[in-house]
From Swiss-Prot:
Biological-process GO terms, alphabetical: DNA repair
InterPro entries, per database record: HMG_box_dom, HMG_box_dom_sf, HMGB
Protein name, per record: Non-histone chromosomal protein 6
Transmembrane segments: none
Gene transcribed to yield this protein: nhp6
Length: 104
């Protein structure tokens, strides 16, 4: 007769994450994300019935095939969005510091 397996489960402590502030600024998009958002619908129209994963794969292949001059407009958009994020983050952090000083 085989022995019964006895196992004990140990409880692991879950690390509580801080809740994300809904008022926090959204991160800037990368050049690839601007390209993907602009071209996703074109890929779906050209390939009806394509799966979500295949759309991403085709977008990645098209991005890699772009020359530097073709990528430049997307990189400029990404740089502008990064600057927007940094500006919003700075003002958001300044507002957070003011709130902490008032509550102290």
């Amino acid at each position: 007769m085989p022995k019964e397996k006895t196992s004990t489960r140990t409880k692991t402590k879950r690390v509580e994450r801080k809740k994300k502030d809904p008022n926090a600024p959204k991160r800037g998009l990368s050049a690839y994300m601007f390209f993907a958002n602009e071209n996703r619908d074109k890929v779906r129209e050209e390939n009806p019935g394509i799966s979500f994963g295949q759309v991403g794969k085709m977008l990645g292949e098209r991005w890699k095939a772009l020359s530097d001059s073709e990528r430049r407009p997307y990189e400029e958009k990404a740089a502008a969005d990064k600057k927007r994020y940094e500006d919003e983050k700075a003002s958001y952090n300044a507002a957070q510091d003011e709130d902490e000083e008032e509550s102290s």
